Amino acid sequence: MDAIEQLVFAGVALTTRALSEARADLDLTLAQWRVLVVLGEEADGATISQVAGRIGVTLPATSRQLRRLQRRGLVDVSRDERDRRATRVRLTDLGQAARDDVISFRRERIAEAAASLDLDPTMASPLARIAEALDQP
């Protein structure tokens, strides 16, 4: 496994750990986490098709995840006021709090790991550009 693959693997492992430790009460899956991440980036929420496109899964699979999250009180699903044919999804306060808790947990663990290393501060920009490029459809 090369360095990039190790970094990706460690990131997924860290997220899994954060989900099980920071918000064990919610028993979130990685798939559900991805939905919370996408919705947290959209102040006005997103349509189901927008969420599906961002996480790269089918509409039926996205709808199933959203129903599960809605039953747990993490998302609110309603008709889009601008386009009554569309359904808009938003994080609830609980969903936003869960997202914030997991992100904080990850940031704390990353800061702890980075503090013990002599890292080049200019590394962050190229890594951010790679992440941005990978997020493009």
Task: Please place each PLM-identified region on the residue numbering.
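N-terminal helix-turn-helix DNA-binding core of bacterial DNA-binding proteins
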Residues: R17-P60, R72
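C-terminal regulatory/oligomerization modules of transcriptional regulators
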Residues: M1, L119-P137
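A structural signal for well-ordered alpha-helices, especially hydrophobic packing surfaces
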Residues: T15, A43, R99, A131-D135
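Charged, amphipathic alpha-helical coiled-coil/dimerization segments
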Residues: R67-S125
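Generic structural concept
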Residues: E5-F9, Q32, T92, A124-A131
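Alpha-helical structural segments
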Residues: A10, L14, G40-E42, G53-R54, ...
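N-terminal leader segment of winged-helix/HTH proteins
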Residues: M1-D27, R72, L134
